[in-house]
Amino acid sequence: PIPVWHDDTNSFSLNTINMPMEKTALWIPKAWTGTGEKDEAKSQLVIPAKRPDLAFLGAEGTVLNAAPQNPGPGNTPIWAGLGAGEIGDTDKFEGETYTLDLISVDGPGRMEMFIDNGDSVNRFLSSHDTAYRSVYNPRHTHLYTTFTQPGRYVANYKMTARSADGTAIYSSPITPLVWQ
């Protein structure tokens, strides 16, 4: 999701790169590193041993469908994190802050968005853990997006901010983003 602020209507919308988010479907194809020595599926994440910080994803050895945090050469299979957006001056918002909320996810399993630092994890958004449903002042961020089951997921997002004088609440419509 990429937040966009519209000064003319005092409202938000959500995009993916240069398209309205509701007109976008993100596809995770079967993709491989193609190194020849050790081909790895870039469209999967296997939960490694001795990483208790990844326990929220499942047990060690669990295989998840994934859009990688850093897809690498050829941009395979897909990278989709958070965009910096077109917000402009944030002084129009109370505390100069605005929020991206994950309202709901409809799909056959769980969806998680996080940063893997190698020895620790920063969780961002989760379909099932309500403690991870909001990101304050979202910025350009590279995230893993994982899915416990293959299939179609519809993630519904909303942007919200309060006016600097506290008299108005600005928000986007609830906007779907499809993953498959």
Where are these regions (language model features)?
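Short, solvent-exposed loop/turn segments at the edges of extracellular beta-sandwich modules
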Residues: 162-167
